């Protein structure tokens, strides 16, 4: 039997920010299942996240997660880490692919200044950036008018593309620590993002799309989930538009993942 690939967004999907005592039993059940499937050589697991690698490690420690996904694609899947001999090691192969084109913070600042001046708006860095980043993320607070927000953000994406840069936007998620009524603005190299990471793994392991199951909860999961035949939006998602587009997990968070992974590996979604 060929291996299956399991893909998880991290914040508010694989990891619940407000995990309580009641949730822990469901978390342990999820980890036990993933450990068993991994040990039986049935699945390959990967986390695809907009968070930094260190943020993922810190959050896993918060709830004492013990299962180690084989791959973690951090910084909006612009960095790849693989579990190897008791530690995560960054992939140099993936790094070379990501950095095959120029990606300079000064250029991104110029793009943001141009749009800021044109529309009299502000873009706020989400964190302190270091040198040679592969993911620069900002907040854009809503103007109070959805159509106006879309006009500004789509202009940003177009202008960035004209400068040979890739910009994405999605609704911020307050449950994951984001501000209310805001958008995430993400700049990554062209060879990055959750869909790119998905296709990279498909090629690496020679896995067809029918053998992949993906989970997500927010706008930056839309492209990769849309690409898959078997994709679930978490029922705890706050994105009403995405809820109309994707199948919802029967249960939220850990319970939902456990149920649908079980059904997937049992062949209930095969056709």
From Swiss-Prot:
Determine if Hydrolase is one of this entry's keywords.
yes
EC number(s) for this protein?
3.-.-.-
- Which SUPFAM superfamilies does the record associate with it? HAD-like
Q: Which GO terms describe its cellular component?
A: cytosol
Record InterPro entries: HAD-like_sf, HAD-SF_hydro_IIB, HAD_sf, SPP-like_dom
Q: Supply the alphabetized keyword list.
A: Hydrolase
GO MF terms here are:
magnesium ion binding; phosphatase activity
Task: Give the family this protein belongs to, as stated in its UniProt record.
Answer: Belongs to the HAD-like hydrolase superfamily.
What's the name of the protein? Uncharacterized hydrolase SA2005
The source organism is Staphylococcus aureus (strain N315)
């Amino acid at each position: 039997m060929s291996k299956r690939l399991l893909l998880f967004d991290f914040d508010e999907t694989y990891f619940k920010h407000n995990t309580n005592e009641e949730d822990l039993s469901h978390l342990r059940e999820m980890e036990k299942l993933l450990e068993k499937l991994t040990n039986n050589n049935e699945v390959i697991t990967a986390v695809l996240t907009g968070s930094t690698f260190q943020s993922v490690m810190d959050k896993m420690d918060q709830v004492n997660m013990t299962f180690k996904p084989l791959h973690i694609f951090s910084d909006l899947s612009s960095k790849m880490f693989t579990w190897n001999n008791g530690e995560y090691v960054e992939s140099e192969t993936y790094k070379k692919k990501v950095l095959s084109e120029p990606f300079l913070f000064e250029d991104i600042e110029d793009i943001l200044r141009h749009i800021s001046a044109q529309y009299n708006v502000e873009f706020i860095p989400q964190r302190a950036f270091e040198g040679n980043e592969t993911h620069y993320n900002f907040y854009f607070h809503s103007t109070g008018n959805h159509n106006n927000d879309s006009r500004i953000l789509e202009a940003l994406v177009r202008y960035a593309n004209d400068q040979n840069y890739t910009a994405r936007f999605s609704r911020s998620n307050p449950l994951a620590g984001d501000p209310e009524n805001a958008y995430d603005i993400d700049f990554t190299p062209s060879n990055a993002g959750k869909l790119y990471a998905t296709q990279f793994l498909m090629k690496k392991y020679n896995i067809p799309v029918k053998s992949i199951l993906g989970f997500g909860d927010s706008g930056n999961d839309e492209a990769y989930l849309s690409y898959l035949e078997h994709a679930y939006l978490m029922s705890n998602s706050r994105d009403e538009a995405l809820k109309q587009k994707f199948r919802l997990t029967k249960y939220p968070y850990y319970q939902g993942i456990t149920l649908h992974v079980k059904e997937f590996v049992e062949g209930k979604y095969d056709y």
